[in-house]
Amino acid sequence: DIDLMMPRADYEAFKRVFPQALGEKYVLQAPNTPGCEISNTFMKIILRGTERLELQKLNAPGAHGLWLDVFPIDNAPASAAARAVRGFFIDALNYLAVSNCLRTFDSAALREYVSVNPAAKRNYRLRMALGALTAFLPYRALYNLFDRAAQMKKNTGWITVPTGIRHYAGEAHRASAYFPPSEWKFEGEMVL
C-alpha cells in the first residue's frame, strides 16, 4: 500500500486520461468518475491480475489487487475558524459515507475482528447504526457527495488533504509547505 497526493486539478486530469494511458495494466477506482467502481472516498489504482483483500471490503464489488492510494490536495479556508467548521462537516460526511459502505459490505470476518477490542466494537456498532440510518442512499452517492463537498475552488493559500489520517483540519497547511514542488532523485532519475 503506497500513498500519493495530487493537487485537485491534477487529480481530476489524471482520472480523465487514465483509461487510455494506463487502463490495460491498472484498474481505477475513484469517486465522481464515470464507469469506475468506487471503493473509497479517494482514488485507488489497482494492478490487474493481483489479489489483495481489505477486511472492510471482502464483499465489495470490483478489483481487489495490489494498489496505490491517491489522495487529492484541496484548497482550504484561510481562517482557522472557517477551517474548523468546514472540517467538522467534511469529516462528518466522510464518517457517514464510510459507515454506509461498511454496513453495505459487512462481513462475519469484520465482526469477528472487531469483537476482540472493546473500542473497535463500539466504533463498529456506531458505524453500523449510522450506515442503517443512511441506507436509503447507495454508498456510491455518499462517496461522490463527500468528494464534491471536499473540493474548494477558491485559492486561499491554504490546502488540506480531506481524506488524510489527521482529517480535514489536521491536514491543513499553508500551500507554500507543498508548492512549488522540488526536484529530487528516485532510482537514479530526477523527479518532481
Which functions belong to the PLM regions below?
Residues 1-13, 188:
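Catalytic metal-binding acidic patch
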Residues 3, 86-90, 138, 176-178:
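Alpha-helical protein-protein interaction elements
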Residues 80-85:
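A short secondary-structure junction signal
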Residues 88-98:
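A contiguous, mid-domain pocket- or channel-lining segment that forms the substrate-recognition surface
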